[in-house]
């Protein structure tokens, strides 16, 4: 009969009949003999029971085995399937040996060790001949749906790039799950469940980067936490790292938060290679990058008009921030279209013009930063009505790229259909094939470096991950394995070395963090504001702020919520430029007469033709019409033919100028509209981004009415960031738009053109942010270590989250954000940011002190302690 083995701090032993107990300094774990070692109880050092109220348990482990000669055939087993389970005492814990697990598994040995601060979990698995271990989920443990007396303060957080706080996870039901994988979205290898008084901590202490995921999922009787490792191991597989579990406690003055779990994780993380040097100490990063730069992004439209970039730099940036280095991200430089790969060259508008722009900007303190699309290879792009494609690279890919592309489990090539390819598709090159590493360096990075680019991001290789590759002819194991982390590490190292041979100040980057590569990159793409959780949790920046600067990848001009969070979180100030910046009074609506044409392609300056929405391709067409127009020399013509879905051309009109802040003025949107034919009603639609207020429309007239002036009067609602104008046509149709105008309605009913100063709330906020980040607050905001922030009590405001694919979710966000920092010399500061355009009262509870503050609209305040 199995003995109950109790390990206390002194590792004393006791015997009983039904269970085994392992105790660490923060957590006691009980394993149930009758359930073949399932975790039946978890108790913190202060006596808080974390387990479910019932006797329910989860099997201690579950495994997936796959045939070595047929990757499509797998079997799954779990601890409860074992014919036998023997528990033995070891010097520092327990060893549980399982046999009789079916056709694929010979034996499993689980170890559970105590005595230190954490309980440590290890496992080895022996596969039978002809089988390989593919997935190992261990340990699995069931926690209570309710910590304490109420679930209302229960929270779950994992170390995900787009993580966040899930409140009351026990109420989410059995279909809820919250997991992330590394390489991939898991930026730090821990998960936590906590309430105000107690917390549970689960982590993988893996310094090598084995492929794994971890997190929680709903179950009938509780919440299951586990770690799942992915590999393809025949014979015996030994987990090469410890999984650890522990507990932590809070007090009424200092309640538990996810920061406590992150602090536990950081004790281990700072001992790893990726934390060898703080960012300021790194000699491989150029001095200007260590001088707290700001950042800006220019799109394809700007690059087609290089003088507009020069004008912005000279008239705005150099006048406002003459001493601040500037990272200049370029989007849309690719030859064929945005994110179309790998036929990048010549770039937009041409190599010579682009290189001169890069050189000129560098002389003014600007550093070029293109983001080529990683390992993706576009095989087809922009599907036409007749089924052909605007760009078809299948023949070249078959000859050059396909032998090195990712292969699915069934032996077929991996194919993806992202929306930006407009009905086309792409392959993914395998980073575990050395050819891919060399191809990326030789054919993508070096040509860009020779054009003068100092910085390059490996975009779309999220967290250093790409799809599982089962190619038998590639020099890596099937499926997943630590070879994936090794391969991307080699990519970053060789990329930096080859770029640096041409450009001594080379900086490399990749999309979304992975802690294993912190020390190999000089700036980090970050997207925590895109979390689907109602409450953001910037786990990566909290852990590694002093080691690597982050920027919010997709900034939204005028989005006060994002700006306030990013500023309080110590992220790089990232500007969204407008052509009116630095020009003095100008019209907010650009090119409403459709007279300014884009260079090198069909289109109008200031207007964007959308490829689609929510995965639906909008494949109608836009034309520059020189014949049919109301006035001037051109009008825009929109057509939707038979078999086509829709066409939309749109523009966001900035509403962050002070003229729009009163809410009392009346404005009129009007346009000359004409219809050739129309199968169903359509209109020029408009809405207010950042506000729940309704929008409106300018309906297209009947064909027999000819040109007709159509208008709508509006009041700008509070909180509105942009007026989005959408010329949208569904069904078979031909329509024209000309003379679109945005004017103010005066008291006598007449109108006058709106002129903005270019000195609105957004400009003021960004100026203050840049000044603090680069100047007075740099010791904290740019280089400081984040520490557990004060608890902030403030109001909330409605907010609509918008996600990739166009889905929306309404929620409430705080009116202010707060974080705390410690400088390299030990000075502490608290940063509080107002996320609204009106004054707000907030209360901070900081180290036993209560402090009430009144924040001015959009204020960023540093409280030096």
What is the predicted role of each segment?
Residues 21-27, 46-98, 102, 114-115, ...:
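Polysaccharide-binding surfaces and accessory modules of carbohydrate-active proteins
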Residues 131-135, 168-391, 573, 763, ...:
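Conserved structural scaffold segments of CAZyme catalytic domains across common CAZy folds
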Residues 233-242, 484-586, 753-829, 835-848:
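Active-site-proximal substrate-binding groove within the catalytic cores of carbohydrate-active enzymes
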Residues 367-450, 530-544:
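Active-site-adjacent "subsite" loops/lids of carbohydrate-active enzymes
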Residues 428-523, 531-534:
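Active-site neighborhood of glycoside hydrolase catalytic domains
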Residues 583-756, 760:
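Extracellular and organelle-lumenal recognition/adhesion modules and their flexible linkers in secreted
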